[in-house]
Structure formats: C-alpha cells, structure tokens
Regions:
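Membrane-helix boundary connector in multi-pass membrane proteins
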Residues: 103-104, 119-133
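Amphipathic alpha-helical interface segments
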Residues: 105, 114, 119, 137-140
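Small-residue-rich segments of transmembrane alpha-helices in multi-pass membrane proteins
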Residues: 54-66, 88-90, 112-125
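Short, amphipathic, aromatic/basic-enriched membrane-interface segments that mark the entry/exit
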Residues: 48-53, 100-110
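Alpha-helical transmembrane segments and their membrane-interface exit regions
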Residues: 89-93, 139-149
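Alpha-helical transmembrane-segment detector that highlights a single hydrophobic TM helix
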Residues: 76-92
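Alpha-helical transmembrane segments and their membrane-interface boundaries
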Residues: 1-81, 127-128, 133, 149-153, ...
Length: 163
C-alpha cells in the first residue's frame, strides 16, 4: 500500500520529458521578465503597481494559459479561460484607479491599462508567442515612457490631445 501511495506522489510531480519542462520554464521566465520591465517603468515613476505586481500578473496569466494546454483542453475551453482572465485582470486593474477629491481628477488609469497589457503579454508568453511578447513589451514601454516625454516637449496639454 505504501509503495502505491509513494508511486502516486511521484507521478504527480513527474514531467514526461526535458523538452516540456524547458518549454514551461522558458514561457514563465519570459512572462515574468517582460512583466518586470513594464513594472520597473511604473515603479520608477512612483506608481502603485511596480515590478513585483507586473511580474506576478504576467506570470499568472502565462500559468492560466499553460494549465489548460497541459491538461489537453480544447481551443474552445482555452478561449473561455482567456475570457475569464481578461475580465479578472480588468477587475485587478480597477483597484489601481483612484478617484481624487475633485470629480474630474482620476488617477491610475495608465497603471491599470499597463496591468491589463501585462496580462496580455503573459498570455502570449504562455502560448509560446515569444516574439509577440517582446514586440508588445517594447511598444508598451514606448507608450509609457516616450509618449509623456513628447507631450512635455511639445507642451501639449492632455485636453488638447483628446480633441
């Protein structure tokens, strides 16, 4: 009986081959690293969601994609997982939004959007789309760091930009 229990425990931790463990590790590390890049930018600007938050969001999103793939779920099932993940991360991002004392003052929208994009990057990493994750991270980083610089340089107010 004890041998049967031990064999069951061992089978739960077994990985069929080195390729699979390498693939899983690579996807999780890529997700965490690229999420960390966006989190670093937010943290340097003193925003509430920084490196750790973005890394965990990206890695969590990658895990939510990897688990159904490993379980052999259909593409329809994976689609439902992605839909739930997108909605759930939207709820998480809502926590980053703060309403100021003035009714027109809302803070944290960019950080919330950054969390949402970070989750999408994690989903892409979990699906093995490393080039998509790298390009998306680069574009998001440009949006977060270069676009505000352009507005400051051109002395364009946000109300002018929205017209």
């Amino acid at each position: 009986m004890w041998q049967e229990i031990w064999n069951t425990v061992l089978s739960e931790f077994s990985v069929p081959d080195a390729q699979q463990i390498t693939r899983i590790t690579l996807r999780l590390v890529v997700a965490a690293a690229l999420g960390g890049v966006l989190g670093y930018e937010r943290e340097q600007k003193g925003k509430s969601a920084g490196v750790r938050t973005h890394m965990l969001v990206a890695m969590g999103a990658a895990l939510f994609v990897l688990i159904p793939q490993q379980a052999g779920a259909s593409s329809e099932d994976l689609s439902r997982v992605l839909q739930g993940l997108i909605a759930g991360v939207g709820f998480l991002g809502a926590g980053a939004i703060i309403m100021g004392t003035k009714q027109v003052e809302i803070r944290g929208l960019t950080t919330a959007a950054g969390i949402w994009v970070t989750a999408a990057i994690g989903m892409a990493a979990g699906m093995g789309r490393e080039s998509t994750t790298a390009l998306s991270t680069l574009i998001a980083l440009l949006v977060l760091s270069v676009v505000p610089w352009i507005f400051r340089t051109k002395k364009v107010t946000m109300s002018d930009a929205q017209e």
